[in-house]
Amino acid sequence: RAERRRACEAAAGKALAKLGTLKRRLYAYQRQGVERFLRAGRLLLADDMGLGKTTQAVAACHALFRSGRVTRGLLVVPASLKSQWLREWHETSDVAVRAVEGRPEERAEQYRAAKRGFVVIGYEQLLRDFEHVRAFDPEIVVLDEAQRIKNWATKSAQYVKALNPEYRLVLTGTPMENRLEELASLLD
């Protein structure tokens, strides 16, 4: 853990310099969130709705890709938010992104073809396509509306935690609703 932290800290400066190549400027608090993530390599971003969690996630992915720290990443989002993520991504970054969709054989081919860039999938799709996702071997995983993995016992939580990317970014507006265990599950 300490070794990973040192590696992230050492690479953060180069990645931070790439924020200047974004299509839009970040607010100071957004830049601070991205910087914290880049230095730590793992972060639970629990801002209120409307403060730009998605923009911060896209900026972090952009910086890591442009600095050569990652070549491919996975964005797991509620299915209803896929188009919003793609729109926000294209407004913020020029790094390649695609939504994986279609019949099972079409999705399998899309994972194989995505050697560089980022893919957007839904939580249910993660369950159906897990072997393809694992073979895709993302170097960063971003979870939006991460309260979906608050319960350790759910398949979604187990599948997400079975992935082992170098970078993890967890986004939620509600990190803890009822029990401390929910927060612990998000941090795991």
Would you name each region that the model predicts?
Residues 1-43, 87, 95, 113-119, ...:
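Charged, low-complexity
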Residues 44-51, 56-88, 166-167:
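Conserved SF1/SF2 helicase motif Ia
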Residues 50, 124-127, 147-150, 174-175:
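Catalytic acidic motif of RecA-like/P-loop NTPases
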Residues 70-71, 95-96, 137-138, 164-167, ...:
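Short glycine-/polar-rich loops that comprise or flank the Walker A/P-loop
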Residues 80-104:
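Conserved helix-turn-beta segment of the N-terminal RecA-like "Helicase ATP-binding" lobe
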Residues 134-171:
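SF2 helicase catalytic motif II
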